[in-house]
């Protein structure tokens, strides 16, 4: 499985997931008004969001 780890004007960066990690995730955490910290990567299970964030998971490549 290959997951996107970052997006920018220059394109995307990806990561090959380790054995047992079969989910890609994207997590947004609110840092301030209209300001979010976004992290992406591989996971064995979908992580849970905290009270200031949101998580989206998928099990497909990129």
UniProtKB/Swiss-Prot annotation:
Compartment(s): Secreted
Keyword Disulfide bond found: yes
InterPro entries attached to this UniProt entry: Snake_3FTx, Snake_toxin-like_sf, Snake_toxin_con_site, Toxin_cobra-type
Signal peptide extent: none
Annotated CDD domains: TFP_snake_toxin (cd00206)
UniProt keyword annotations, A-Z: Disulfide bond, Secreted, Toxin
GO cellular component: extracellular region
Record-annotated disulphide pairs: 3-24, 17-42, 46-57
Tissue occurrence: Expressed by the venom gland.
PROSITE patterns: SNAKE_TOXIN
A molecular function (GO) term: toxin activity
Function: This protein shows a synergetic toxic effect in that it enhances the toxicity of other toxins.
Subunit structure: Heterodimer of C8S2 chain 1 (AC P01410) and chain 2; disulfide-linked.
Protein family according to the UniProt entry: Belongs to the three-finger toxin family. Short-chain subfamily. Aminergic toxin sub-subfamily.
Protein name: Synergistic-type venom protein C8S2, chain 2
Natural source organism: Dendroaspis angusticeps (Eastern green mamba)
């Amino acid at each position: 499985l290959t997951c996107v780890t970052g997006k920018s004007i220059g394109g995307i960066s990806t990561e090959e997931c380790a054995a047992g990690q079969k989910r890609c995730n994207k997590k947004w955490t609110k840092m301030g008004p209209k300001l979010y910290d976004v992290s992406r990567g591989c996971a064995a299970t979908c992580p849970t969001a905290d009270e200031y964030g949101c998580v989206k998971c998928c099990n497909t490549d990129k």
